[in-house]
Amino acid sequence: MSPVLFEIKDSIGFITFNRPDKLNSFNREMALLMQEKLDACKSNEVRCVYITGAGKAFSAGQDLAEVADPNGPGMKAILSEQFNPIVIKIKKLEKPVVAAINGVAAGAGANIALCCDIVIAAESASFIQAFSKIGLIPDSGGTHVLPRLIGWQKASALMMLGEKVSATEAEKLAMIYKVFPDEIFAEEAMKIATTLAQMPTKGLAYTKQLLKNSVNTLFEDQLHDEDIVQQKAAQTKDYKEGVNAFLEKRKPEFKGE
């Protein structure tokens, strides 16, 4: 069985971590396959990406058995060849990426999730920056993303103490978008992905680009960037469809063009 499942349905690229017996922890095969599936999501056939885990976990991060193997990849390779390309690809995808957290998201698993555009979680899910427990630092973009989501103090405490954060607390901290009761989680997650897949894909991609760039941009420069990108958005077929649908008082039919 493949450690990463992939399917395109209704314009959504579904990526499922599939090592449930290992809490979907990553080994080299799984990490490289994840990169391959993210590349497949560049297709115009995909207008939204949906990432989740099989079984009881989203992902427990790096498989420590591989780290302990003297014949396994070293730490440099694990980061530069396995995890870093994953989060970079997520950030660069020109479409929304939804992380549907069905269980524990730990270590690199948590940070892969937090690098996604919209993170939703089941009530029973949890997040933990487990690195400090074994003498490592948070990787996979964690030290960049988490303090920007929840602030320096809280991020420092969670990363240094390695405390588990429930999905409910994560929502209160603005670490994630929304939490749902377990019994309706899958249904609600699908509603969000379906909505995004039916929206103007290029407009969403431009929004994602501007949000990402805003981290290191001065206000006046951001206004300039908005000016340029808005002109591009106004040239899309979906913009024209949106305006026409509004004037004609009908539901728009966006094509992602």
Question: Which residues are covered by each model-predicted region?
Answer:
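Crotonase-fold acyl-CoA enzyme core
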Residues: 89-204, 235-236, 241-244, 250, ...
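Hydrophobic alpha-helical membrane-association signature
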Residues: 30-34, 79-82, 112, 185, ...
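Conserved CoA-thioester-binding segment of acyl-CoA-metabolizing enzymes
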Residues: 1-54, 88, 176
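Terminal peptide-recognition signature
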Residues: 15, 19, 33-34, 51, ...
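Helix-loop "lid/cap" segments that line or gate small-molecule binding pockets
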Residues: 158-160, 210-214, 229-234
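Glycine- (often His-adjacent) and acidic-residue-rich active-site loop
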Residues: 32, 53-89, 105, 218
